[in-house]
């Protein structure tokens, strides 16, 4: 709290236009006016976002994480995107993650290049496929969820 607050004061004194984002200001309202230039949360439901935006918001609202693409998800993206047209103070959100975290290795059996994630090397403890939650694979090939993102983002060009 105190260090982030000091950083925000520093940037304000420099008057260089930098904005400060700190998600935990939602959980500690003592810093709400000094620690973040945004109202921000992770994974708030669309109705929770609207509750803030309908009650005289003091700051723009950003979802610092709002879609987690584990498996083949993104099904709720449209509910959040509708808020963009409805509220000037809603500035969207950030998808977690854009890209899978994996490394390319040569498979010892087939000799082919394959992507490997946590746990594929008998490493323990491991996050296993939890690092495979992007909208593109680690080799930059698109996952099916990218179709949903492309559709909704395309409406706002």
What is the role of each PLM region?
Residues 1-139, 144:
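Substrate-binding/catalytic cleft of secreted carbohydrate-active enzymes
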Residues 139-157:
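Surface beta-strand/loop "capping" patches
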């Amino acid at each position: 709290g105190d260090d982030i607050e000091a950083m925000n004061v520093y940037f304000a004194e420099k008057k260089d236009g930098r904005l400060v984002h700190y998600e935990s200001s939602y959980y500690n309202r003592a810093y709400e006016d000094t620690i973040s230039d945004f109202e921000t949360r992770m994974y708030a439901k669309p109705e929770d976002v609207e509750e803030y935006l309908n009650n005289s918001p003091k700051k723009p609202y950003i979802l610092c994480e709002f879609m987690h693409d584990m498996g083949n998800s993104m099904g709720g993206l449209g509910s959040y995107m509708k808020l963009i047209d409805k509220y000037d103070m809603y500035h969207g959100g950030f998808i977690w993650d854009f890209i899978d975290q994996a490394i390319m290795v040569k498979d010892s059996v087939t000799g082919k290049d394959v992507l490997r994630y946590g746990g594929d090397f008998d490493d323990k403890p491991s996050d296993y496929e939890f690092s495979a939650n992007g909208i593109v694979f680690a080799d930059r090939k698109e996952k099916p969820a990218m179709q949903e993102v492309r559709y909704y983002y395309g409406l706002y060009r």
